Design a protein with these regions (language model features):
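Long, charged alpha-helical interface segments
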Residues: 134-147
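Structured adenosyl-cofactor binding patch, chiefly the S-adenosyl-L-methionine
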Residues: 85-128, 134
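Short, low-complexity, polar/charged sequence segments that are solvent-exposed and flexible
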Residues: 20-22, 47-48, 67-71, 93-96, ...
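Short, flexible active-site-adjacent loop segments at beta-strand->alpha-helix junctions, enriched
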Residues: 54-55, 134
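Gly/Ser/Thr-rich loops at beta-strand to alpha-helix junctions
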Residues: 6-9, 80, 99-101
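Long, charge-patterned amphipathic alpha-helical coiled-coil/hairpin "stalk" segments used as oligomerization
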Residues: 55-95
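A short acidic, often aromatic-flanked loop/helix-cap motif at beta-alpha or helix-coil junctions
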Residues: 33-39, 56-57, 99-102
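RNA substrate-binding interface of SAM-dependent RNA methyltransferases
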Residues: 1-52, 114, 118
Length: 147
């Protein structure tokens, strides 16, 4: 996760806290120019997917994105995304043609990308695992949770 153009260390702390508790290999950083980050990603051979309500509908392009075999950067912008993002992105992808939240766009994209398999992911080093339940919250604290 990269939060460019900011130095808010609280963002880093929040993501790192989630990773400590729920596991996974997420990395987070703040700062730097968004343009430099995107251009560097592209020059290293990766692809950039920009989630917007103005792009190609997700169902029409997801197979192509998934089968590219390239490292993927997902850009989730808000209402004030610079125009250059649209021209730099490998794909401008719409999750709907109506206004939506950035986190909703990312969630919908990831669900399509992983084809629903994210419900069965097991993240290494998880201290907490969520157990599906028809009512209420159920979690398991793993042996790593006593660190």
């Amino acid at each position: 996760v990269i939060f460019p153009d900011t130095s808010d260390m609280k963002l880093v702390e929040n993501v790192e806290d989630v990773v400590r508790r729920f596991g996974g290999s997420f990395k987070v950083s703040v700062g730097g120019s968004w343009r430099s980050i995107v251009e560097s990603w592209l020059s290293s051979g990766g692809i950039v997917v920009h989630l917007t309500m103005y792009g190609i509908p997700l169902p029409k392009v997801i197979d192509e994105i998934r089968s590219s075999g390239k490292d993927l950067m997902v850009v989730v912008g808000g209402a004030k995304v610079p125009r250059e993002v649209y021209s730099l992105a490998t794909y401008n992808v719409s999750v709907t043609n109506q206004p939506h939240s950035e986190i909703a766009a990312l969630a919908v994209f990831l669900d399509y990308y992983h084809q629903g398999k994210e419900f069965y992911f097991n993240f290494e080093n998880a201290k907490i695992k969520v157990v599906p339940s028809p009512s209420g919250k159920k979690v398991i604290f793993t042996s790593r949770g006593s660190d």
